[in-house]
């Protein structure tokens, strides 16, 4: 049995299989999930698990080169926008929400949280550890 880190076997496999520039989406419970990416649904109830909980864990486990968000998060969800800016030392890349949704089609996986606040979504772009 795995002793630490992310125990979810689906997430652990996706992380182990990532290559440089591959992407993972962390989604609120309302984001449409396209056909193609692996769907990992963690939602239990509204708000559980939260966007911030899941994102924090993934940032600990994954080499992240940059993060993309919908530009609308800046005004519609200041709390999660500030969280991302503090949790990630580099500037966030922002695109309009329709472009963001289109980008999810190329992701290796979409992790659905129980988060129910506007634009609580991000795309993590894999970096390298060397």
Curated annotation (Swiss-Prot):
GO terms for molecular function: D-ribose pyranase activity; intramolecular lyase activity; monosaccharide binding. Gene3D superfamilies: RbsD-like domain. It catalyses: beta-D-ribopyranose = beta-D-ribofuranose. The active site is at residue 20. Keywords: Carbohydrate metabolism, Cytoplasm, Isomerase. GO terms for cellular component: cytosol. It is an enzyme of class 5 (isomerase). Substrate binds at residues 28, 97, 119-121. The keyword Isomerase applies. Its EC number is 5.4.99.62. Its main location: cytoplasm. InterPro entries: D-ribose_pyranase, RbsD-like_sf, RbsD_FucU. Belongs to the RbsD / FucU family. RbsD subfamily. This is D-ribose pyranase. It comes from Bacillus pumilus (strain SAFR-032). The lineage of its organism: Bacteria, Bacillati, Bacillota, Bacilli, Bacillales.
């Amino acid at each position: 049995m795995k002793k630490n880190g992310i125990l979810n076997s689906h997430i652990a496999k996706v992380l182990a299989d990532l290559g440089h520039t591959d992407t993972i989406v962390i989604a609120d419970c309302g984001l449409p999930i396209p056909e193609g990416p692996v769907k990992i649904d963690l939602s239990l109830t509204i708000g559980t698990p939260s966007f911030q909980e899941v994102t924090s864990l993934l940032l600990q486990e994954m080499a992240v080169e940059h993060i993309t968000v919908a530009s609308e998060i800046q005004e519609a969800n200041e709390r999660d926008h500030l969280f991302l800016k503090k949790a990630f030392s580099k500037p966030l890349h922002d695109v309009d929400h329709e472009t963001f949704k289109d980008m999810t089609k190329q992701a290796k996986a979409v992790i659905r949280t129980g988060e129910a606040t506007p634009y609580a979504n991000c795309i993590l772009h894999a970096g390298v550890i060397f």
